[in-house]
Amino acid sequence: MMLAPFFITDNAAVNKAYRLAVADLQANILPFKDGILESEKPVIIAGLGYSTPWTRDSAINTWNAGGIICPEVSLNSLKSVLEENEKGYFIKGDY
């Protein structure tokens, strides 16, 4: 289970929104191996009904808060949508 950073304000609606967002994020973390990941690791999938991360979603999730709330999972997500060849790394799949 992911332990998210604790966040509380004097605004009950903001506190509730944060808790709901973290719960949604946590529900979308699954084990996965693809791209340049060397073994199966937790990643953020594209959402309910998906079984894999998507390139655009991985970037947006990392930018929006994943990089702060779950940095290792966010890094795994980004690595899972990269490929490597003799010229270096490149984005695979959808953009």
Model-derived features: where do they sit?
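Helix-terminus loop motifs that line ligand-binding clefts
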Residues: 36, 69-95
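Low-complexity, Ser/Thr/Pro/Gly-enriched N-terminal "stalk/linker" regions
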Residues: 1-53, 72, 76
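Non-membrane alpha-helical segments in proteins
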Residues: 56-67
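N-terminal structural segment of carbohydrate-active enzymes
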Residues: 51-53, 61, 84
